[in-house]
Regions:
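Short hinge/gating elements
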Residues: 23-27, 155-158
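Intrinsic-disorder/low-complexity, polar/charged segments enriched in Ser/Thr/Lys/Arg/Asp/Glu/Gln
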Residues: 14-18, 48, 143-147, 194, ...
Length: 248
């Protein structure tokens, strides 16, 4: 599997950061998108982080990210822990990318055009226009492998001038789910349970990128996948391994 299952606990002096997931950045109805939330928490720890989502993510409400200098953090809603995080090394074999043109062509085969468990999802929802959502519509490019073209907009930029971790991790989220659907024919909704991501290179607005997802395995209600973002030269900008949990 592409991550460890080690427990992590806040034990040292911590720092607290206000956090909020706007309802616009939803995944399932009335819950924040998992990848967006992963990046929101993980940016407090660094460029290689494991985040475990434990409960549905409240939207339009006040939360806190409490971080420990030892490299652990938690997302809290009042006294309830929504997610936990720790620095972790990503162990994932990333396949070679495809061309932007190939990824753009794959969008036409996105199965979510016909049946979509969460059509209002910020990342892959077909009810979201591309000025309101990310519109990452991944189509099959191989057995259990999906891809989409992606040209980030200036909205995604952070203060450093690159696409923020929230949006990079969002891009690393849903393509993995669609790869699992393509490989295993999973019916009914399933949600992100854990993501371990690594940010390798800055991602910029207006540039051409390819996002790919590939299935890695399935055990009962859990399924495992990898995702990556590639630049126009095929170099990996970011990658993630994830566990998804079937809830329907």
């Amino acid at each position: 599997m592409p991550y460890s299952n080690a427990a992590h606990t806040l034990e040292n002096e911590t720092t607290s950061h206000a956090a909020r997931v706007a309802s616009r950045f939803c995944g399932p109805p009335h819950s924040g998108n998992g990848g967006y939330t992963v990046g929101m928490i993980g940016k407090r720890l660094g460029s290689e982080v494991e985040v475990t989502l434990k409960r549905p993510i409240p939207v339009d409400d006040h939360m806190q990210v409490v971080a420990d200098p030892a490299g652990v953090a938690a997302l809290l809603h009042a006294d309830t822990e929504i997610a936990s995080a720790r620095t972790a090394e990503l162990d994932l074999d990333v396949p070679d990318g495809i061309t932007f043109a190939e990824a753009a062509a794959a969008r036409a085969n996105f199965p979510g055009y016909k049946v979509h468990p969460f059509p209002n999802c910020y990342v892959c929802g077909t009810n979201r226009c591309c000025s309101d959502g990310m519109c990452l519509f991944t189509g099959s490019v191989g057995e259990g492998v999906v891809a989409s073209s992606w040209v980030p907009t200036a909205e995604f930029l952070n203060e450093e001038g690159g696409v923020g971790p929230e949006f990079i991790c969002a891009a690393l989220d849903c393509p993995g789910a669609w790869a699992l659907i393509a490989r295993y024919g999973i019916e009914g909704p399933f949600v992100l349970g854990r993501m371990t991501y690594r940010l390798d290179k800055p991602i910029y607005a207006g540039e051409r990128y390819v996002v790919m997802g590939w299935a890695l395995g399935r055990e009962g209600r859990k399924a495992f996948c990898g995702t990556a973002v590639y630049d126009a030269e095929g170099q990996v900008c970011a990658a993630a391994g994830a566990t998804w949990i079937q809830i329907g």
